[in-house]
Amino acid sequence: MAFNSQPIEGWHGKLDLVYADRSNSTQLIYNHQQAPLKVQRPFYPEGEKVCHSVILHTAGGVVGGDRLSYNLHLQPNAQALITTAAAGKIYRSEGLQARQTIDIKIDAGACLEWLPQETILFNGAIYRQDLRVELATGANFLGWEITRFGRSARGEKFYQGEWRSHTEIWRQGVPLWIDRQWLPGNEAVFHSPHGLAGQPIVGSLVWLGSAVSTEIIAKARNLGNTQGEKGVTSLENGFLCRYRGASTSEVRNWFTDVWQLLRVEFFSRSKCTPRVWQT
């Protein structure tokens, strides 16, 4: 089944954010936004060093033909945590592809914690997401992605549509991690062990920029009381966690435990769960 990958109508939301370190306080110094994307006023629940930001999609959901473009830049030594106000919803399409593109640049000594809430693909959604991160020497990135295929609470399964996810993380022209995922919506793929194995949720967490010890890898594997499948893979400059299962809270709890582990190890910071996750 062929899909139209060139949207000809719909929203084109844009969000450009620049963070800078000012006397050991991270400030959002540039903010350009175009509906339906918007960022709330920055706040500092753990002190001035780390700037917390919450992104909103004011239209409530994404339809075929929509385009969302993000450009995020952390200047040297800036520290930011960015999440979203709610789960993303990708609605059923009549043939047009919805697309999200995120470009992130992290300068020396800076760290971004990119922690969006889950994305829910309705049956029949046609969606592509691209994430590219450019790391300077001494920069760090922690990001996760949690995707639910079908509104499983209603018994819906992802039997129609298409999902593509392309992720690239680079440092000075050298690829640190390249990930390509494609899932066509059909019953065979949904139940195949090479697809979703009948499970509606997949998740990935990646930490890149600083090498981790074998002890950290072992701890990450042992964290979380999960019924779903999970795995941890060591990378040259970090590591990768994968999940496939049936519970959003299960995967997020595991990812949050891993995130906390890294915060303590590399920044001597305690967990600071975004309040918006509890609303």
From Swiss-Prot:
It is found in: Cytoplasm. Coiled coil: none annotated. Pfam families: UreD. GO terms for cellular component: cytoplasm. InterPro entries: UreD. The keyword Kinase does not apply. One of its GO terms (molecular function) is nickel cation binding. Keywords: Chaperone, Cytoplasm, Nickel insertion. The keyword Chaperone applies. Required for maturation of urease via the functional incorporation of the urease nickel metallocenter. UreD, UreF and UreG form a complex that acts as a GTP-hydrolysis-dependent molecular chaperone, activating the urease apoprotein by helping to assemble the nickel containing metallocenter of UreC. The UreE protein probably delivers the nickel. Belongs to the UreD family. This is Urease accessory protein UreD. The lineage of its organism: Bacteria, Bacillati, Cyanobacteriota, Cyanophyceae, Nostocales.
